[in-house]
Regions:
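Charge-lined substrate channels and their catalytic hotspots, especially those that engage the 3′ end
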Residues: 1-287, 291-336, 375, 396
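Conserved catalytic alpha/beta cores of large enzymes that bind or transform nucleotide phosphates
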Residues: 307-398
Length: 398
């Protein structure tokens, strides 16, 4: 157990009461080596919001001091709710914060609030923000307006209710009606709004493509990948080798199909179904085995976790993984072998799953279908779609 963990464990003891740093160190009976690191450990824990130092310089656990640490979620109406990092019970609600008690905190900030219990059952607790631990909006996308001596940016995100003041020297080419990215240089206080400088002009509001660029900048979406991530993707072979088939169930003989949008390039799941002689059904669902290529805590894995998901915009896709994987070896393209994880099920005539297996497989997708083709076959019964897919009509009847 490291020093920070020991400090927290000591503070969570039932008999603990808030103490100054010196008495806390004495009570823990720290060694000389621990004492060298003690102040830094306290500072880190305080920055993390795991402990609180009050106005009397006493250290304690937030929940025992009627405080809550969490992330502020604002509404367009000017009030917000704190989503606690930790809930001591399921009954603990989010904390309602009136606009007058925000104390310059902005949407997404990690904050500490002094809390009063809910006045009525079923209502949220109410709080006043007393400290901002971490600012969330260092860069903001919005519309620029200028005057002779200064400008301001109205954020696109309606949860950011205050305009950002921009000194004339920080316009950097922005004009009234420009969509811009502004970087905060001074955080707001009780008497003034936040101040910033324009770091990128995306174009004029309403111009083609500016709306998409605005979304990309607002959510920090990048079409390119860090060098180590791209290098890892470039080193992945684009065809599986026979050695990789060992230990996998060979399903290359099944006429598995994928069903996706017309323009989809990352085809990550396929399906096959048939009726058994006794009237029951076999159903196989095959998902690209991305984990075979994206190893835990390696560059590809870390980047994928950071991105969280692929993002589909009007005119482009921002992939979670480089295209060498998302559109290549991890895409279940027709006519090539691919590694997949499968859930293979036996289903009764009444539609109940009677058994299933989750197994690694190697597959060979028979055909790429689209939602339009499936609709033409199953609903419209239209030619030439019926004839073109006669060989898999039995599956659709299943």
């Amino acid at each position: 157990m490291d020093l920070k963990e020991r400090i927290l464990a000591y503070m969570h003891e039932e008999a603990y009461r808030p103490l100054p740093a010196e008495e806390l160190a004495d009570g823990m009976q720290l060694t000389p080596e621990d004492l060298v690191q003690f102040d830094a450990a306290l500072e880190e824990l305080e920055k993390e919001g795991a402990i609180i130092k009050n106005r009397s310089d006493l250290y304690g656990i937030p929940s025992r001091m009627h405080l809550v640490v969490g992330r502020l979620s604002m509404t367009a109406k000017g009030f917000g709710f704190i989503i606690p990092d930790v809930r001591d019970s399921e009954e603990e609600t989010d904390v309602f914060v009136p606009g007058a008690d925000l104390n310059t905190a902005m949407h997404g900030d990690r904050v500490v609030a002094r809390v009063t219990p809910a006045q009525e059952e079923g209502r949220s607790r109410e709080g006043e923000i007393i400290r901002i631990l971490e600012r969330a909006n260092e860069k903001i996308v919005g519309t620029f307006e200028s005057s002779k001596t200064f400008g301001f940016v109205t954020p696109d995100n309606t949860k950011l209710s205050q305009d950002i003041f921009v000194p004339k020297k920080a316009f950097h080419g922005a004009k009234t009606g420009s969509k811009v990215v502004v970087e905060i240089t001074k955080w707001p206080d009780r008497r003034r709004n936040a101040e910033g400088k324009v770091i990128e002009v995306l174009g004029k509001v309403g111009d083609p493509g500016v709306d998409v660029l605005s979304v990309m900048r607002q959510y920090d979406l990048s079409e390119t990948f860090p060098e180590d991530v791209q290098e890892a993707a470039d080193n992945v072979e684009q065809e599986p080798s026979p050695e990789e088939y060992r230990g996998r169930r060979d399903r290359r003989d099944l006429p598995i199909v994928t069903v996706d949008g017309e323009d989809s390039k990352d085809l990550d799941d396929g399906v096959f179904a048939r009726r058994n002689p006794d009237g029951s059904f076999f159903l196989g669902v095959y998902i690209a085995d991305v984990s075979w290529y994206v190893r835990e805590n390696q560059p590809l894995d870390r980047e994928a976790r950071e991105r969280g998901t692929s993002v589909y915009l009007v005119d482009r896709v921002i992939p979670m993984l480089p295209k060498e994987l998302s559109n290549g070896i991890c895409s279940l393209n027709a006519g090539v072998d691919r590694l997949a994880m499968a859930c293979e099920m036996q289903i009764s005539p009444e539609g109940e799953v009677t058994s299933y297996e989750i197994v690694p497989t190697v597959i060979h997708v028979y055909r790429r279908l689209t939602y339009n083709i499936v609709n033409k076959v199953l609903v419209d019964k239209a030619e030439p779609y019926l004839s073109d897919n006669q060989d898999i009509r039995e599956m659709s009847a299943t």
